[in-house]
Amino acid sequence: MRKIQAKKGLSIECKGWEQEAVLRMLYNNLDPEVAERPEDLVVYGGIGKAARNWEAFEAIEKTLRELESDETMLVQSGKPVAVFKTHEEAPRVLISNSVLVPEWANWDHFNELDKKGLIMYGQMTAGSWIYIGSQGIVQGTYETFAELGNQHFNGDLAGTVTLTAGLGGMGGAQPLAITMNHGVAICVDVDETRVDKRIDTKYCDVKTADLDEALKLAEEAKERGEGLSIGLVGNAVDIHQAILEKGFKIDIITDQTSAHDPLNGYVPQGYSVEEAKVLREKDPKKYVELSQASMAKHVELMLEFQKRGAVAFDYGNNIRQVAFNNGVKNAFDFPGFVPAYIRPLFCEGKGPFRFAALSGDPKDIERADEEMRKLFPENEKLLRWLDLAEEKISYQGLPSRIAWLGYGERAKMGLALNRLVRDGEISAPIVIGRDHLDAGSVASPNRETESMKDGSDAVGDWAVLNALINTAAGGSWISFHHGGGVGMGYSLHAGMVVVADGSERAERRLERVLTTDPGMGVARHVDAGYDIAIQTAKEKGIHIPMIDKAGDK
């Protein structure tokens, strides 16, 4: 085991900045400021890892240092398996993580292979080396709660209390996103270290293990109409049940525990973190049974809050499916967050554009933010987000920024960043990527593609096509994964990263990749018959051969 830290500065140890970018982002994923359990190579999301084991990690390191600028390294579930001569505008790395043949695409088979050292769970950005800490999901979470406020609470969350659970790498964004919308958040986590991490990074305001204290703080903040986030240490099922018994009014209920992984991601009711760890190793089968039973109860409690007037939604961890499989037949009575709040953005090719400063200098991000304001002065949502981000976001590892941009905007910003690097206004190359949760890169029937207009929720072709077109367009590293967010058997998804190093070659690649990538999002939603997507494609001149038939669905 080694302690990995994000590498900063202007000197490089690889044969080019592109290879150096891959290495630095791999290191960044495992920086203690960023990763959940770096000693185990776990970045976030239960067992979402950056490399299969330490031996494979060191082989990846060595290969990247030796990789020529016209070669491509292939990575199979966190292990480097080949290097081939390609060309300078091909990706330097192609990654496939935890992809199983459908009949065997379940946790039992995955865990068998994992024990044999043959596979690795890459989550979404863990195994594709573009995780930037909780900031990576904060804006999406912020936009989700903002839209919820628009739909249900006259445009704002002031005077509301949200109850949720899970303060890991993804869920850790919730307290900050809710307070950014002026709401009160009670965020439950059984693991006190996770609450502490969110307090340390200022994503969460206060910590307590006393439910009565949490409710008192929440009520007082609600009456004042002020935002406040409370990290409450405890088991979600116990806490939810107690709040219902006390009759305390909850306005919004959701959940972001790692319920997608019943063995490694969720702690059953009645167990401490340490007790759960012992049982997990001693009797994994019993652990999963207890975990799934707790999830069923968890969803029943969420449904009861909904019955009492709370706005309920699933935050993409597949907890409804587990509950349904364990006897809760009305588990899907509350919607997922994508169809409820996010899909119109996807129809315009909008999604989680993100970039990181390889120099490690926060001034590079400040300059990039300034440029974004100049490029998109009419985008009020973006400007408001940048104000909030600059005020409230603490960097984890390499300085970075998330900014939801749409078709046309991403290419424009990417080219601007490349120009700033070329002209020395930004001191070192910038890495540009995104979450796999994006407009055209995921097939996930219980999350991103839930309730598609044409019923194409489970069609996986789109995620494959996204990876293929971004490879053809010349991304710096491209990934294809299975099971991220919602667990084995429930999702296929692709990621892309492209490096802005100031060169003409980078300019060509940036323009191509940052057009094809969001373009796939528009195309996917055109094909499903969404009017916003059809209008966007026509306005932007995206060539969709059968667009005139799309509206018939």
From Swiss-Prot:
KW NAD (keyword) present: yes
Residue numbers binding NAD(+): 45-46, 123, 169-171, 189, 194, 235-236, 256-260, 266-267, 315, 485
Protein name per its UniProtKB record: Urocanate hydratase
Substrates-to-products reaction catalysed: 4-imidazolone-5-propanoate = trans-urocanate + H2O
Cofactor notes: Binds 1 NAD(+) per subunit.
Protein family (similarity comment): Belongs to the urocanase family.
EC number(s) on file: 4.2.1.49
Broad enzyme group: lyase
UniProt keyword Lyase present: yes
Organism: Staphylococcus aureus (strain N315)
Role: Catalyzes the conversion of urocanate to 4-imidazolone-5-propionate.
Organism domain of life: Bacteria
Coiled coil: none
Pfam families for the chain: Urocanase, Urocanase_C, Urocanase_N
Keywords: Cytoplasm, Histidine metabolism, Lyase, NAD
GO cellular component, one term: cytoplasm
Biological or metabolic pathway of the protein: Amino-acid degradation; L-histidine degradation into L-glutamate; N-formimidoyl-L-glutamate from L-histidine: step 2/3
GO biological process per UniProt: L-histidine catabolic process to glutamate and formamide; L-histidine catabolic process to glutamate and formate
GO molecular function: urocanate hydratase activity
